[in-house]
């Protein structure tokens, strides 16, 4: 694909369908974005958004920190998605400005956008969860994993290597 683009100056890209995830409410204390995305993947399956875009929207989306939003978008691939996106809001624009990247344009979904599917998740009902071996959609409540001895743990990677994650792990 890369060589073809260099030679012809063109590229072929299939624009993915969008799947809308309307988020309501607010995550309870001690519940994190990874609990939310694992809950979503547990419901829709590891292939639930194959070659699609996961669009996170709604009043609940606005309550999530930028770090939480990054975690959801990063893990969208675990549901087979090509991308995960949030609608640009004041919090996102302010984050960009604070990091020297004022947006040149802000885009929003069309009011009459057509989605392949739509889901609603009440953030206040999300509970801590874990994905058991061997699949990311093998999601169970965290209390079902209590009592399992852990010899090693890794906090890092693109999924949970932000300073917020390290602080929680240190507690």
Predicted feature residues:
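Fe-S-dependent hydro-lyases/dehydratases of central metabolism
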Residues: 1-171
């Amino acid at each position: 694909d890369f060589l073809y683009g260099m030679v012809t100056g063109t590229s072929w890209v299939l624009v993915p369908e969008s799947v809308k995830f309307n988020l309501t409410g607010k995550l309870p204390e001690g519940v994190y974005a990874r609990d939310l995305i694992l809950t979503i993947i547990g419901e829709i399956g590891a292939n639930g958004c194959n070659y699609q875009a996961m669009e996170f929207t709604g009043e609940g989306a606005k309550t999530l920190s930028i770090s939480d939003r990054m975690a959801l978008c990063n893990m969208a691939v675990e549901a087979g998605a090509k991308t995960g996106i949030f609608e640009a809001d004041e919090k996102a624009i302010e984050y960009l400005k604070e990091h020297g990247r004022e947006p040149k344009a802000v885009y929003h979904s069309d009011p009459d956008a057509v989605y392949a599917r739509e889901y609603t998740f009440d953030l206040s009902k999300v509970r801590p969860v874990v994905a058991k071996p061997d699949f990311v959609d093998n999601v169970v409540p965290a209390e079902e994993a209590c009592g399992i001895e852990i010899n090693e743990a890794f906090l890092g990677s693109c999924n949970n290597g932000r300073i917020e994650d390290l602080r929680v792990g240190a507690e």
